């Protein structure tokens, strides 16, 4: 059982356990020891977003890594996917990202990439933890002549800009497009405007003045209303909003309407199917994706495979099946032909390429998917029992599933952080599925708790 690492590395409030400098140093020491392999010099890349606490955590990690005889390459503020890309392109042994993604500035996190740019498997994280808590690490220190050095890599932003531009079709550019871009005062504040401008777009950039405390503060992908208003005000062709570490992206069309991750996947998957570029004709999404996505992809001759929630599970499924496109409704998109992890700017470029190739507006492209009506009811529970072991609940769910068949679905799952059961239904008739969701919620409430409908 892991104590430190969650689904996306180690997370917490800065300067509070486990996000303290003491623990960051221990994580650095343990990781450096585990990534060492043979007698040669080893190197670990470290990058971060724009949080105030990034400085202290970075210095602690650097000290820990160097103390175990491994060199550090510091790239400064850079999108999470940029750190993955530079780790593999510079042939480092691992990459470290200091970020809490879309969380407020008070939070921070530490996550690792392996030398090939993929997130670490659970067993590697477990080995790092075991070494930290074993108390053995002090006996593994190298002698004074073997400690590591730290180097600053000054051209990391430029390297990543060049890489991103290389993923955009050579026969296209962005001239004639006016784009509102919200960088969330985060890690992409230099990279994203440079990429779009160098490809010929007129860019109205907001959220590009980080001060250490304004990352994700009323800006970025969690606040699409901000770019929606800006698109209408500037009469732009579309809006693009990234989150703090730029691993996810949300769009708004020329009318200011949000275009979420499901629509982006539908646009890209159907376009790749037409070009015979979607491997195995398969898109990988999560159980949270709307069934309208399945319908759109199936109509275009493809299929959708669903995983548990979390981009790491999407990537695992893609690697296992040899697929090249996956993502989440929240805006994490993985184009494995180009990069190894969710990449907001890269995803934006792929959508812009479809727009330019077909000379269509984003609102027209988004019509490829019609979302099914969706209803979500939360039930407060006293215990997280498998609801299918409650006969009357299981019976009702079975009856409803028989009625919706292929034209809807029921998704029932517990919240990972609260004592809530989430009952989600999709179907063609909003009135009907609302009634069914309430029926399920009432039976659950009767058996295992008190209700909070939302």
From Swiss-Prot:
Binding site for Mg(2+): 101, 243, 245, 247
CDD domains documented for this protein: GlmM
Modification after translation (UniProt): Activated by phosphorylation.
Catalytic-site annotation from UniProt: 101
Free-text remark on how the cofactor is bound: Binds 1 Mg(2+) ion per subunit.
Cofactors that this protein relies on: Mg(2+)
Protein name as catalogued: Phosphoglucosamine mutase
Organism: Geotalea uraniireducens (strain Rf4) (Geobacter uraniireducens)
EC number of the protein: 5.4.2.10
Residues with Phosphoserine modification: 101
Catalytic activity: alpha-D-glucosamine 1-phosphate = D-glucosamine 6-phosphate
Cellular component terms per the entry's GO annotation: cytosol
Family of this protein: Belongs to the phosphohexose mutase family.
Keywords: Isomerase, Magnesium, Metal-binding, Phosphoprotein
Keyword Phosphoprotein on entry: yes
Record-linked NCBIfam families: glmM (TIGR01455), PRK10887.1 (NF008139)
Biological role: Catalyzes the conversion of glucosamine-6-phosphate to glucosamine-1-phosphate.
Domain of life: Bacteria
MF annotations from Gene Ontology: magnesium ion binding; phosphoglucosamine mutase activity; phosphomannomutase activity
GO biological process: carbohydrate metabolic process; peptidoglycan biosynthetic process; UDP-N-acetylglucosamine biosynthetic process
Keyword Phosphoprotein: yes
